[in-house]
Amino acid sequence: MLRIKAFPRIHISLIGMNSDGYRLNGGIGFSIASPTLDMSFEPSDTVDVIDMRESGFTPEELDRLKKHLEKIIAKEMYGTALCCTICEGKIQSHVGFGSNSMIYQSCIEALLVLNHREYNENDVIALSGRGGTSGIGINTYFKGGLILDTGIANRGQRGLAPSSTFMSDVGPKPLILTELKLPQWDLGICIPSIVPKTEDEERAFFKTNCPIKKEEVESILYEVVYGITSALMEEDFDVFCKSIDTLQYTKWKSLERQLYGEKLIEAESVIRKAGAKCVGMSSLGPLLYFFGDDIDTTVDQIKKVMPSCICLKTSFNNSSRTVEYD
């Protein structure tokens, strides 16, 4: 049996969501140590995927994954398929963990191992079809740490849309500008009792809100480079927190946050009152991440006020996924 343990990512923000610049997309995010996504794989004659998570893939999403794997098996002439089990855990789909990329890449890597193929990171990324919009999750899977990418050159070949839109398009991958090992800081994550957005709703959001203005992108970029990345490199916790908070009110992130209205604002208020120094929303949410001086106490207070939420302490992760083969 083959086992892969992957670490989720927090996606701080997309960046170049304008259509009149040198590049498209780009983003910044980091890997966290827990909760982990644990998957097991066995060789099989046919592809099968069993999702044991309480909030996992829809039947349509499971079917899409199986068809993607079957297409690769046929194209690459693999002799062995696989039976994949996504184990129980707190990694939900479509809340901001980057679970889709983790699952697709884990399945591709398992296929390569079970078929005794030599491979590298780029092979797994290319076959997964992920990373068409953001290079965060596809790279933290292998590297951990913080990733800052500048998207792809704007040559009119793509529009602005979520990564799932580009899965059949083997195009250029985002350019990684910075890979950074992170300090030993704790943080908390909170998944409020808010219904997450579906892939169709995510596509509709991009269609409605893209492009944004170049000057709005510049505001995001200032916080990303001069604020968040620089503060992490210098381990300046106060500036990091200030920049995370400021970023929430830049154009793109504020549009994402508006999807959840007052419910998100109320959850964030509870987190701040519990002691958080800064609060951000990962990707399209509704997962909120937060930093502070005493994460344990903050988590306990949040659970008392919002008992229906999922809230836990974690930390930055600088490690790759783990692969074990019996």
Where are these regions (language model features)?
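ATP-binding N-lobe of GHMP and related small-molecule kinases
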Residues: M1-V95, E109-N122, G132, N317-S319, ...
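Conserved PLP-binding catalytic core of the aspartate aminotransferase-like
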Residues: P286-L288
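Glycine/serine-rich anion-binding loops at beta->alpha junctions
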Residues: E88-V113, G132-Y141, V279-L284
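ATP-dependent small-molecule kinase catalytic core of the GHMP/sugar-kinase superfamily
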Residues: L2-K5, S13, S19-G27, N120-K277, ...
